[in-house]
Amino acid sequence: MDIHKLTEEEANEINTWTYEEPYNLYSFSGEKEVMEELLDGTYYGCCDDQGDFIGYFCFGANAQVPGGRDAHLYGGEGVTDTGLGMKPALTGKGMGKEFFQAGIAFATKEFNAKMFRLSVATFNTRAVTLYKNIGFKQGPIFLSRGREFMLMEYERPSA
């Protein structure tokens, strides 16, 4: 997989993505402000081995959920907050593990990341199962915009 700074073309595509219920909270609005965030340098596009754009990763504060920030859950040194999204047509097709592991490997190399943290809606059992299978551990649960989220953390084994 190829992971690279998100291009404007990829950002435009992401900004049209809509997901079916109950995953629609991950849908994009198409607003100009969203484009500005997608192109602020913290987002990375991911293409499969055929060169097709399949999803994105973001690292840092943009991967944090507002309710978790309000609850002061994002402290700590050396923790890389991680967000990701896969093209809606590709979700639930068994590609998530390879996709997400590619993002972890990229952040490890690019940022020397050792500890990863993500926020996931608790109803999203597909994602929670994937993250647990990779080695993420469940952390605190919090509310954000009326929905329940969970922090999960993963410490990369030393080489």
Residue ranges and their predicted role:
Residues M1-I14:
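A short beta-loop-alpha structural element at the N-terminal edge
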Residues R117-V128, S144-F149:
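Conserved beta-strand-loop-alpha-helix junction that forms the acyl-donor binding cleft
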Residues K97, T122-P140:
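Conserved active-site alpha-helix within GNAT-family acetyltransferase domains
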Residues E8, T16-A89, E110, F142-L143, ...:
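Acetyl-CoA-dependent GNAT
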Residues L90, G94-G103:
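Conserved acetyl-CoA pyrophosphate-binding loop and the N-cap/start of the following alpha-helix
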Residues K109-S119:
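Conserved GNAT acetyl-CoA-binding A-motif
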Residues G41, R147-M152:
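Short hydrophobic/aromatic beta-strand or adjacent loop that forms the aromatic wall/cage
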